[in-house]
């Protein structure tokens, strides 16, 4: 792990680093004189309060074309100046995430001191990028009633479906998936400020993190014709954080509801059948406060936000020992601080720290499915040490050459614990007829993951041409530790003892991976047509580190040797997109493309080879003293089936990474 981290860091230092993951916003166009002739050498300056440096500039090339890239979302004014011509100032240009606005102007002959200010409709169509994208701006995020998270908002995108629809924020505590155009639910990619933040565990599509809506300036959803910067197909979710500014500003958002804001369809027939308490909302609320501004004007900005939100739902026909209906209470708190420093004229640094904590009081266990869990037999989810840390540097070396670099980390501690109210000596008991767990949860899960991302690229930009080359490297591990009370689970049928599971806990698994992507993405405009060719190379290596686990009731302490490079994938994915400005006025574009995409994957692929995995014996249980507590002499060991040694799976040495077109 340390070696792979060092290698990735060294690569980042050697390359002239970064435009990290997706297309940047920009402004482009052509400058002409009244006769229609193109004008080279025109100085074009884009200015906006959202830029800590104030403005960015370039000059038109010999064909009169210009392009200014790496602009943050916001409102811009663009000024065009050339000796012998009146200057032109175009105002009200609105840029969203990964959007290139086309602004063509005509300069009139006159004195430079004379100026013309034009305020008109901002370009609405990106005629250069072939990517299909929908953007939820801050205004939309504030006005549309949703659960205030990227998944609930993503349901509004045309063509996007979700595994768990959210109504009124009742489902925001668990992360669903998004699909588009028949994509897999494992192909979502989550990014913050253009950096992929998913950890290596499970199928590779999990973050284990819950996002603060107040942090977001915009959320971009890219759904087709994705460029070479994108690691996979499917839905790419890019959350653009807010920066501070030269003016102090703050907002407060508050919403809430309870049982009085919903109808009740529980009728006498259902109650007569024994269903006397339905699932319903107990309470729901969301409080989100933001504040930001200058520490030093035009040099150092800060932005901070705190969010506390909760969704508490009553569980149908589930009651505690006092007869009260049990509730699944879920609470999340998140605090974020962002600093933006314009260190020198050509060097900008952004530092981002986001800390989140989640608690869920009544969650079903992750091992054995039951229709109903007694409150003491569910698990208590506590996620206390989750944070996102990022340092990002960018430098426009010249008007045509842009470099950036970023280092990103995201520790995840995702724990599903025994209920504090459960008796320390309780044994998990499952009634197979009633499908009910009693006593305590059958398993406690301690989940730990670490992920480090390093990204770098360099962009060369002219009026008609934008060439970008870069890399993205992710390395990390995912680990789970399993514990079972007494290392045993009892099975009954309508209260009659049947069998027991003798479990090899403490057990679990740990897997690691290193995923490196190298890409080249080009964009070239020929008249009204822009082509976007690219190619991406990916190397993905998965291993099982050396690991140890202590002794349990039925098994001794164990140590397992490292298994290196079980999966070693090397893939090449060509990408090609095209965009046609149909009428040449920047209002209508026809887009298309053909591309190869790897499927998103996680280190769970090699988990079946981990000898530390959970396993168990199933044995008959004869409860001689009728105390519903299995003693050793009541377990018929001679008739046990299964094994305390995990049944190892098989990973084909020639396994190829799945892909799609």
Where are these regions (language model features)?
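Solvent-exposed loop/turn elements at secondary-structure boundaries
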Residues: 163, 546-573, 577-661
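Periplasm-facing N-terminal accessory domains of Gram-negative outer-membrane beta-barrel systems
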Residues: 2-137, 156
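Periplasmic N-terminal accessory/gating domains of Gram-negative outer-membrane beta-barrel systems
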Residues: 85-245, 262, 269-280, 284-293, ...
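Transmembrane beta-barrel wall of Gram-negative outer-membrane proteins
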Residues: 249, 279-360, 381-410, 574
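Hydrophobic, lipid-facing positions within transmembrane beta-strands of outer-membrane proteins
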Residues: 176, 207, 233-235, 285-289, ...
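Transmembrane beta-barrel strands of outer-membrane/channel proteins
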Residues: 120, 252-258, 304-308, 351-355, ...
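Outer-membrane beta-barrel channels and translocator barrels
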Residues: 185, 216, 242-244, 284, ...
